[in-house]
Amino acid sequence: MFFRHEITKTVRKEEAFPIKKRKFARNYKEYMGFFSDLIQYGYLSNALAACVLSGITCGVIGTYVVCRRMVFLAGGITHASFGGLGIAFWMGANPIAGAMIFAVLSALGIEWAGSRGRIREDSAIGIIWSVGMAVGALFMSLRPGYTSGDLSAYLFGSIVTVTDSDVAALAALTAVIIAGALLWLRPVMYTAFDRDFARSRGIPTRVISYLMAALVAVTIVLSIRIMGIVLLISLVTMPVVIVNSLSRSYRTIALAAPLVAVAGNVAGLVVSYNFEVPPGAAIIFTLTLTLILVKLLSLRQKRLPFG
């Protein structure tokens, strides 16, 4: 009863859909009941919109993250953001705003440390990763009235708490990322694959690296409500890996990965609604099955004789 339990905690009782035992959906109409309920329940519309928008942003940003081989960096930023979230929670401020500041500063700090050679990048990521989680847990526990549910909502996501302002912020970020991809796809692509070559072509690699690090941080923080800190890194990487199994073109991956992420998000949300399982886990499970299927199909094609 996970999905319905989350809803009854976050919306008024009369707004929640009727509490009844929902067994495994037995027919097509039951599966499609989710889409018909979108009209009746506003929070489902917000959840669906957030899934679509976060899928687009994570798909595009994930292409850069995977091709640049900075998945560990993205994981460090994700967990470091918990520090800002905990401090803001303790102060009574907006937790997402606190996480945003902490994540952006962490991303820029790691990028600066790596470029200056003052400290190894992997060491800096490991330090920020653990310190961020420790600071977040400490300050959240210091707030009066703290419960474990407050921590769980951010670690594993709580998609039914997505508000109109969250959707608006994701929409603005999506517009910025799409515009940036259309205008600067080639310079970003060169920077992701070979910074020395990009620098020889006159591309400002340092500026692009800092901007992309900040965008990675913003994308991660705005998607926390959907996936949670623990699972979010998979949404950034798995759609790219799925498409990369079929294509080696950066442009193709950048275009197809968001579509895969959106499809996985929506499918996971529908599964969560019908089977009463955590939305974040359902999304990752859906993407994992897709990845396994794609890998099996690609292996089968390689074994088929030509002609």
What label would you give each PLM region?
Residues 10, 19-56:
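Membrane-interfacial amphipathic/re-entrant helices at transmembrane-helix boundaries
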Residues 34-37, 41-46, 125-184:
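Transmembrane helix-bundle core of multi-pass membrane transporters
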Residues 44-55, 93-104, 221-234, 281:
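Structural signature of hydrophobic alpha-helical transmembrane segments
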Residues 48-53, 96-101, 123-127, 167-172, ...:
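Hydrophobic alpha-helical transmembrane segments
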Residues 63-146, 243-255, 272-275, 299-300:
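Short loop segments and helix-boundary regions at transmembrane helix junctions
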Residues 163-239:
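Helix-loop-helix "hairpin" substructures at the membrane interface of multi-pass membrane proteins
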Residues 226, 230-281:
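Transmembrane alpha-helical segments in multi-pass inner-membrane proteins
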Residues 277-307:
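Cytosolic-side transmembrane-helix boundaries in multi-pass membrane proteins
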